[in-house]
């Protein structure tokens, strides 16, 4: 099964959800030939909404679409994370290694990337020092 087909299916589902501003796929699905799950990071327009409900809704929609497309994926194989309040170290990894799937507000996304990059540079010495302990 081709990754491109899976990526297109994920894009189609995410485009239909008006709560999502931008989304990335990242992790082993992007970096390795074989993978156990598909990590998806979504930035939503209302972070006060219940992120577990949003994540569950999207996982359900992805599994329904996967079944229609004859792809062998269950909802549990989609790991959907709301990234609005994620730690900047995690966001750096998503932005650096991930593949952008949808982007309804490029200015917001690039502002967040710049903010994460700045925060990472500010704390790089502390992070390096802490990892050598």
PLM regions and their residue ranges:
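Short hydrophobic/aromatic beta-strand micro-patches
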Residues: 41-45
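Catalytic core of pol beta-like nucleotidyltransferases
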Residues: 1-22, 30-33, 49-133
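A short, glycine/Asx- and small/polar-enriched loop/turn
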Residues: 34-38
């Amino acid at each position: 099964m081709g990754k491109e087909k899976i990526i297109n299916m994920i894009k189609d589902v995410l485009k239909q959800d008006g709560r999502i501003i931008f989304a990335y796929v990242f992790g082993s699905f992007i970096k390795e030939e074989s993978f156990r799950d598909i990590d998806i990071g979504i930035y939503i327009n209302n972070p006060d909404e219940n992120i577990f409900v949003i994540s569950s809704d999207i996982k359900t929609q992805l599994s329904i679409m996967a079944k229609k497309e004859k792809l062998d994926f269950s909802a549990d194989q989609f790991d959907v994370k709301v990234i609005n309040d994620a730690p900047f170290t995690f966001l750096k990894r998503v932005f650096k290694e991930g593949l952008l799937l949808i982007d309804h507000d490029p200015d917001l996304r690039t502002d967040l990337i710049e903010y994460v990059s700045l925060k990472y540079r500010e704390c790089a010495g502390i992070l390096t020092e802490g990892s050598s302990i």
